[in-house]
Amino acid sequence: MSSQVFCISTGQTVSVCLPANEDPVEFPGAFFTPNAKKPTVYIKKETDLSLLRSHVYDGIKDGSVTVSQINSYLYMVLKDIREKPDKNWTSFGVELGKKNEPMGIFDLLNVEDVKGKELDKKGQDTRLPGDDLWLPTLIFGLYRVSRATQVEYKKTLMTNLYAQCKLRTKDAEEIVDETAEFFNAWANDSNFTKIVAAVDMYFHHFKKSDHAPIRFGTIVSRFKDCAALSTLSHLQKVTGLPIEEVFTWVFNKSVQDDLLRMMTPGQEIDQADSYMPYLIDMGLSTKSPYSSTKNPSFHFWGQLTAFLVKSARAKNALVPVDIAYHELTTAALLFAYAIGRSSELEQRFVLNGKKFTKEKDSREDNDTTPPSERNVVVWLAWWEDIKHEITPDMKAFAKRAVERVGDIRVNSVAEYARKLFA
């Protein structure tokens, strides 16, 4: 897309444009259009589970296991799990399960059998079926560990993972060192990630299943690359406003554009049992429209607002690059200040008919005292009255929010706010 400008000195009309250096987003709904179909996973369906189990155990122990063997093993040990949905289960027009009829994990996928290298039969049939109680938990847990970036957090995850394995059976073994990295490559295999997503999607639906704790490792697949959606949900919670009222506090076009894209209809964002939360690992999208990368203005504005209203979680959010910091910061401060200066406290129950009646506020035309209500129209009128100038009290409000924070992450929202307001 290009626009035209006129050069005064030469009299030329110049078409101006920017390089198209970003891939377009892909919405999950597009995967199912025009034909509603399940995502396809390619798996070598082994016939000898006993031999496969031994290969996988030994391969995980020495780091030589292939992701193809992992996929085959997971399929073999999980395919017979059955649960009955309490209602018909559909997503994007795809029928996944019928009410009160048994269904399995792999009913969420179209499974294609593929040929592959035969397993070496050199006397490796040494493991017992009891391993199937804990090996899948270990495998999925290693996927979660592979996505962690901080060393100490990885160590904590490994400790908790082995605890989960022990809960499955006391015979679980600690066969992977906390410094191992061979499993990091599994995330690059689309068949493996589809299995991860299907397992999490299945047990998110059947939360009471005896096998549901396996989600310790798979849960990171849900809403992967959807940080901006998480920001929206978090902002709604910490402000205490209905979601539609949060939208009325959007004053920046870049934030508006991000939200319009995220709210593209027909994507099943608000359907808990949809394929949508697994758009990345299911292969529905290669570029999420809900990531912080694709929605940097909204993500920054939302996280800074949340931080200023004392959200502990928001302090570690990373600050995006190349956004309109000044405008977004001003808008976030105004929103947070309005939330911090006002409340929606009122009597909710009465006894013996004794109800407090609030007198209507009467503001003078030249009154520059901040409003005591959360009506965005009233606040914008006040903002006009003070000539769009950040007041000393607004600065003090932001400074108090910054001063309460201890350790601060580099390039985080908290670091940005401290440099600006402290």
Curated annotation (Swiss-Prot):
Gene3D superfamilies noted in UniProt: Nucleoprotein, Rhabdovirus nucleocapsid protein like domain
- Which cysteines pair up through disulfides? They are none
One GO term of the cellular component aspect? ribonucleoprotein complex
Keyword DNA repair present in the record's keywords: the answer is no
Mind listing the UniProt keywords for this protein, alphabetically? Capsid protein, Helical capsid protein, Host cytoplasm, Ribonucleoprotein, RNA-binding, Viral nucleoprotein, Virion
* UniProt GO MF annotations: RNA binding
Residue ranges, annotated region (Interaction with the phosphoprotein (N-RNA-P)) = 320-390
Q: Where in the cell is it found?
A: Virion; Host cytoplasm
Annotated spans, Interaction with the phosphoprotein (N0-P): 1-180
Q: Where is this region: Oligomerization?
A: 180-320
Q: What coarse category fits the chief subcellular location reported for this protein?
A: virion
* Outcome of substituting residue 413 to I: In strain: Isolate CIN0360R and Isolate CIN0360V
Give the residues the record marks as binding RNA.
Answer: 320-422
What does the sequence similarity comment in the record state about its family? Belongs to the vesiculovirus nucleocapsid protein family.
Functionally, this protein is described as follows: Encapsidates the genome in a ratio of one N per nine ribonucleotides, protecting it from nucleases. The encapsidated genomic RNA is termed the NC and serves as template for transcription and replication. The nucleocapsid is bullet-shaped with the tip containing 8 turns of a conical spiral before reaching the helical cylindrical trunk. Nucleocapsid assembly is concomitant with replication, therefore viral replication depends on the intracellular concentration of free N, termed N(0). All replicative products are resistant to nucleases.
| Record's subunit section | Homomultimerizes to form the nucleocapsid. Binds to viral genomic RNA; this interaction contributes to the virion assembly. N in the nucleocapsid interacts (via C-terminus) with the P protein (via C-terminus); this interaction allows to package the L polymerase in the virion and positions the polymerase on the template, since P acts as a bridge between N and L. N(0) interacts with the P protein; this interaction prevents the uncontrolled aggregation of N(0). Interacts with the matrix protein (inner layer); this interaction contributes to the virion assembly. Interacts with the L polymerase.
- Protein known as: Nucleoprotein
Please name the source species.
Answer: Chandipura virus (strain I653514)
